[in-house]
Amino acid sequence: HINKQLSTEVLMHYENSFENHDDNDDGFYDKPKVEQYNLQNRWLWAGEKYIFHGGIGALKEHRNGGQTGHRGNDGAELFRIGLDTERYEAYMKHAFIIDRHKGTNIALMASGSMHMLDAGYGHKTYDVNEKNVYASLVFETNFTKMHNLSAGLSLNHDYLGQTVRMVNDKEASPVRMNEKETVPGIYAQYTFNLDHRLTAMAGIRADHSSVYGTFVTPRLHLKYMPTNILTLRLSAGKGYRTPHALAENNYLLASGRRLVIDDLEQEEAWNYGASAALNIPLL
């Protein structure tokens, strides 16, 4: 704590797995060598009517694996795998408290990140440069102890620059692929709370993707406590996701198989869930 309102923390992590093993004696390392640096700095300002939370982070990692050595053919080239990763990110949240008793506030959130990966699987290569920017504006208030409303706007932008050589031939020319998507959206969420016994939350949001067009996402959550030791939950909702086949599965380049990537549509799914939890105090 610097003073009553301002506090900060610095987090650092270092990892070095410098030893390799081949316990099953198959000529390949059982796990890669990893050297990683991780740094984060967070700040918090908590005032009477204004709260700020922000931070920055950086990560750098080297990961190497592959064959341990030659097996009877010293002239053959060893199969090596190497991944060099760098990631930088920053985020902030500004909260303006209008009425503390009613829980009325407006919050502005923003974040940005850059992620770079240089990967090699033998002579196959995969280099990616990803940039993301996200911002949202949220309003929340309690009409009464039983009724709460949250509504907001959001904007998400993704850029994915990829360069890939999908054949194990160092003379082959890499292929460059760029993907961009901007998604503005709006949402509203209503929560009903009855003496902490029954909680019902219904939400809906609408987004417009520059790639896939407009889509609507509803959801519903129910929580019921008939007794102090039994909790019942039900949930249902719809979800959408933009697939990035190579970014999510680039490890398959280590295989000798031929990879074929079709034009992928936006993923769409309904999700349902139910649970019952029993809490029995022993003492």
Where are the language model's segments positioned?
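Transmembrane beta-strands of outer-membrane beta-barrel pores
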Residues: 14-18, 45-49, 58-62, 98, ...
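Repeated loop/turn-to-beta-strand initiation elements of outer-membrane beta-barrel proteins
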Residues: 5-8, 49-52, 99-106, 145-149, ...
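Hydrophobic, lipid-facing positions within transmembrane beta-strands of outer-membrane proteins
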Residues: 1, 35-41, 56, 86-92, ...
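Surface-exposed extracellular loop regions of Gram-negative outer-membrane beta-barrel proteins
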Residues: 5-24, 36, 103-122, 149-156, ...
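Flexible loop and strand-edge segments within Gram-negative outer membrane beta-barrel domains
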Residues: 17-40, 46-106, 112-130
